[in-house]
Amino acid sequence: MKYIGAHVSAAGGVDRAVERASELEATAFALFTKNQRQWHAAPLTDEVISAFRLACEKHRYTPAQILPHDSYLINLGHPVAEALEKSRDAFLDEMNRCQQLGLTLLNFHPGSHLQQITEDECLKRIAESINIVLNNTAGVTAVIENTAGQGSNLGFRFEHLAAIIDGVEDKSRVGVCIDTCHAFAGGYDLRSEEACVNTFAEFERIVGFQYLRGMHLNDAKSEFNSRVDRHHSLGEGNIGKAAFSWLMKDKRFDGIPMILETIDPEIWKDEIAWLKSEQK
């Protein structure tokens, strides 16, 4: 069974994100557990934690259906020691927040070398950052998202994801999330069923489906292999609807959160309903 939803707002409290997901008739959702554009946030209170857990229970969302996202400020491959430390501390806080809320996944963008260190050195730092944080937490899997490769961001090649995983000691607590827009902008074709078959055969060969913990379902305003990250509504961009229909019919994508980050929240409910209908 597919878990399908969207990245919903947590404005007014994390429990409100659950309500918003339910209103969309979503079977999955993503959220930020704190303001994604700030380093620090007030600790989660017992009251907030309880409200979130009760809302999940009420609307029947299990941790397997929820894919929280970390702050955009974090760079686990930062070339500067002080900034790297700050990112690691912030990521540890994000993992702890997930643990407190009873969540088992945390999605994050791997990191950027900022033209100051080599790609290999940056990938090593990212793996080292994950090891440090996993050693200081329990029960939460670090989920690496592929990127479009804008600027000096790494993670746009499946080989980058494989290299990071290779450097992680506890492989039971590391996974990946594939964003369709990022993959397309990063040079992986998805414009036809045949292209999807080939792209995910490459994913299986280089990374492996055993590490797939989530998907971000986005069409692309950006051109193929442009290394530009611009999302679009399903069927409105350069990928087209065939890829999303194909994904819905492939059992390898069952049981993981599949999250819309498309550009028009007004049609999320319709997009979710369409995706559900394509499973047949």
Swiss-Prot record:
Any one GO MF term held by the record is: DNA binding
- Binding residues annotated for Zn(2+) 1, in chain numbering: 69, 109, 145
Keyword terms, alphabetized: DNA damage, DNA repair, Endonuclease, Hydrolase, Metal-binding, Nuclease, Zinc
**Domain of life from the UniProt record:** Bacteria
Question: Which Pfam family is one of those matched by this entry?
Answer: AP_endonuc_2
Name the needed cofactors: Zn(2+)
For this chain's record, the cofactor binding note is: Binds 3 Zn(2+) ions.
Annotated residues that bind Zn(2+) 3 are located at 182, 229, 231
Q: Which Gene3D superfamilies match?
A: Divalent-metal-dependent TIM barrel enzymes
Give yes or no: UniProt keyword Zinc. yes
Q: Which InterPro entries match?
A: AP_endonuc_2, AP_endonuc_F2_Zn_BS, Xyl_isomerase-like_sf, Xyl_isomerase-like_TIM-brl
Q: Does the keyword Cell wall biogenesis/degradation apply?
A: no
Q: Which reaction does it catalyse?
A: Endonucleolytic cleavage to 5'-phosphooligonucleotide end-products
Sites where the protein binds Zn(2+) 2: 145, 179, 216, 261
What is the enzyme's class at the highest EC level?
Answer: hydrolase
Q: Which BP terms from GO are recorded? A: base-excision repair
Enzyme Commission no: 3.1.21.2
> Which family does the record claim for this protein?
Belongs to the AP endonuclease 2 family.
The protein's job, in short, is: Endonuclease IV plays a role in DNA repair. It cleaves phosphodiester bonds at apurinic or apyrimidinic (AP) sites, generating a 3'-hydroxyl group and a 5'-terminal sugar phosphate.
UniProt cross-references to NCBIfam families, sorted A to Z: nfo (TIGR00587), PRK01060.1-4 (NF002199)
For this entry, the protein name equals Probable endonuclease 4
Species of origin: Erwinia tasmaniensis (strain DSM 17950 / CFBP 7177 / CIP 109463 / NCPPB 4357 / Et1/99)
Name of the coding gene: nfo
